[in-house]
Amino acid sequence: MRHRKSGRQLNRNSSHRQAMFRNMAGSLVRHEIIKTTLPKAKELRRVVEPLITLAKTDSVANRRLAFARTRDNEVVAKLFTVLGPRFASRAGGYTRILKCGFRAGDNAPMAYIELVDRADSETEAAAE
């Protein structure tokens, strides 16, 4: 029985899922918008939002925790220097999911996941 087990399996084993979301979180922080399937986008929210909350208080301990979860110094630097101060006054809900149709090959529902206060100069074409 799978009672009270949260999160989606996404037809992957645990280590593959962990690596995939680590990479996707890094891409989202780096580019501020990415295109993926809708279930992955919904699950990615659960990974990225705590990272941004962590980045709101800049300390060595928090930077180490963020590095442990992303394994990327560039991402950690952007989290704490750009995104942490940007979302300092926001209590949560740092990401937005926009449905964008279905994938041509297998008709999978696709979505953009983006940071809410993203600069308008970047286009959605950059996400693809």
From Swiss-Prot:
The keyword Ribosomal protein applies. It comes from the Bacteria. InterPro entries: Ribosomal_bL17, Ribosomal_bL17_CS, Ribosomal_bL17_sf. PROSITE patterns: RIBOSOMAL_L17. GO terms for biological process: translation. GO terms for molecular function: structural constituent of ribosome. GO terms for cellular component: cytosolic large ribosomal subunit. It holds the Pfam family Ribosomal_L17. Keywords: Ribonucleoprotein, Ribosomal protein. Belongs to the bacterial ribosomal protein bL17 family. Part of the 50S ribosomal subunit. Contacts protein L32. HAMAP family: Ribosomal_bL17. This is Large ribosomal subunit protein bL17. It comes from Proteus mirabilis (strain HI4320). The gene is rplQ.
